[in-house]
Regions:
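Substrate-binding cleft of extracellular glycoside hydrolase catalytic domains
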Residues: 1-25, 29-124, 128-130
Length: 133
């Protein structure tokens, strides 16, 4: 079994030397949401690199209202992954949660199971078509 961490800007300042010393073997970082980069993404990538903590994956928190927006989020995510210098072996996760549904409802869009599946497929198919996992 491996010991990893999942972090986003909500964790604030991270002492990556202390994290590495604690036995953390990999990281999964929030890359962003909508068309916005997580405020700590690049800092966390650099902190992981400086302390030999492999970034095994990133996740994009979705606020898509349709499949086209989900694909656009995938394209945005890939652009940030490339900008960070992460390789094609980086696993890209699609994060569709309650807040995704809540925000959509506030905009008059009801998201159910069918939309969740369609958006997830659109995002993941885009990611895999660009050589990522």
């Amino acid at each position: 079994m491996m010991k990893g961490m999942d972090i986003s800007k909500w964790q604030g300042a991270v002492d990556f030397a202390k994290v590495a010393a604690s036995g953390i073997q990999f990281a999964i970082l929030r890359e962003g949401y909508r068309q916005a980069v997580d405020g700590k993404f690049f800092e966390y990538v650099n902190g992981c690199r400086a302390n030999n903590i492999p970034v095994k994956g990133v996740y994009h928190f979705s606020y898509a209202l349709n499949a086209d927006q989900a694909r656009n989020e995938a394209a945005f995510c890939i652009a940030q992954v490339e900008k960070a210098g992460l390789g094609k072996d980086t696993v890209i996760f699609y994060d569709f949660e309650y807040d995704t549904v809540k925000q959509a409802k506030e905009k008059g869009v009801n998201l159910g199971k069918n939309e969740s599946v369609a958006f997830t497929k659109a995002f993941c198919e885009y990611v895999t078509s660009h050589g990522y996992k």
